[in-house]
């Protein structure tokens, strides 16, 4: 790939994603780009930071229905190494036997369903959600695409597709809505630091009743049982 070819492609992609008005346009473009890179399927998976004990995971894909159903039935999400950010030490992640060494049932099932080669790129969103873009193919043969070219293109595709979906307020990328005032965020920051209501009142030069009022109001806004959960969610999603 010549530099001018990549930068021409990059300009085209940036314009396309900026002009998209629906999520369907985003997914259609991802599918088209996967095909141009000689891959048969794509999957865009978003893992949210909350709830902590059962994080919200959403995905959109053109995988065969049989594979999606089998994957979900076997709860492969819990062991899938391509959705573990710790594995991305060198940019994009190529699927191979070593990667799936601790998830052999998943790897064997994927190949049995026709997924013999794949690659994944991930990105952290401003709301701390993790987005994983995967391309996979049925053929086991090597593809004539340089690793650097593939990585650069997938980096742009995962970034621009997720940013477009955020701009469109698509549910796949949106975390729980937390519309807090400036004062509420101030109180949240001190709550996250472990300060009591009385201590926060002294720091901000307001009454303790005012602090408690704001904390209760924030709990109502996100249906949280206590102020600790509000502060934890706000920190986990990058609000404070």
From Swiss-Prot:
Disulfide topology: none
Keyword Lyase tagged: no
SUPFAM superfamilies referenced in this protein's UniProt entry, alphabetically: C-terminal effector domain of the bipartite response regulators, Pheromone-binding domain of LuxR-like quorum-sensing transcription factors
DNA-binding region: 197-216
Gene name as annotated: sdiA
SMART domains from the UniProt entry: HTH_LUXR (SM00421)
GO biological process: cell division; positive regulation of DNA-templated transcription initiation
Native organism: Escherichia coli (strain K12)
Single Gene Ontology MF annotation: DNA binding
Protein keywords: Activator, Cell cycle, Cell division, DNA-binding, Transcription, Transcription regulation
Protein induction: Repressed by glucose.
Function field: Activates cell division by specifically increasing transcription from one of the two promoters that lie immediately upstream of the ftsQAZ gene cluster. Activates ydiV expression in response to extracellular autoinducer AI-1 (Vibrio fischeri autoinducer oxoC6).
Domain notes: Binding to the autoinducer occurs via the N-terminal 170 residues; as E.coli does not produce LuxI autoinducers endogenously it should be able to bind to a number of different AI-1 autoinducers, which would enable it to detect other bacteria. This was shown to be the case.
Keyword Cell division listed: yes
Gene disruption: observed consequences: A double sdiA/ydiV deletion mutant leads to decreased cAMP levels which inhibits quorum sensing system 2.
Stretches assigned to the HTH luxR-type domain: 173-238
Protein name per the record: Regulatory protein SdiA
A Pfam family annotated for this UniProt entry: Autoind_bind
Superkingdom of the source species: Bacteria
């Amino acid at each position: 790939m010549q530099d001018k070819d990549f930068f021409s492609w990059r300009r085209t992609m940036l314009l396309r994603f900026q002009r998209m008005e629906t999520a369907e346009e985003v997914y259609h473009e991802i599918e088209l780009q996967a095909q141009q890179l000689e891959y048969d399927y794509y999957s865009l998976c978003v893992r949210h930071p909350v709830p902590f004990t059962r994080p919200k995971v959403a995905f959109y894909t053109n995988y065969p229905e049989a594979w999606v159903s089998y994957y979900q039935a076997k709860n492969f999400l819990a062991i899938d190494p391509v959705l573990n950010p710790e594995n991305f030490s060198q940019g994009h992640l190529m699927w191979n036997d070593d990667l799936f060494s601790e998830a052999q049932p998943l790897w064997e099932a994927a190949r049995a369903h026709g997924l013999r080669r794949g690659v994944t790129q991930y990105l952290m969103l401003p709301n701390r959600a993790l987005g994983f873009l995967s391309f996979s193919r049925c053929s086991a043969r090597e593809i004539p695409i340089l690793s650097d070219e593939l990585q650069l293109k997938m980096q742009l595709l995962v970034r621009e597709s997720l940013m477009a979906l955020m701009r469109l307020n698509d549910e796949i990328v949106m975390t729980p809505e937390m519309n807090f005032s400036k004062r509420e965020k101030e109180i949240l920051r001190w709550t996250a630091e472990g300060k009591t209501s009385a201590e926060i009142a002294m720091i901000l030069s307001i009454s303790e009743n005012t602090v408690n009022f704001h904390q209760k109001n924030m709990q109502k806004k996100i249906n949280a049982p206590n102020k600790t959960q509000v502060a934890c969610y706000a920190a986990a999603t990058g609000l404070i």
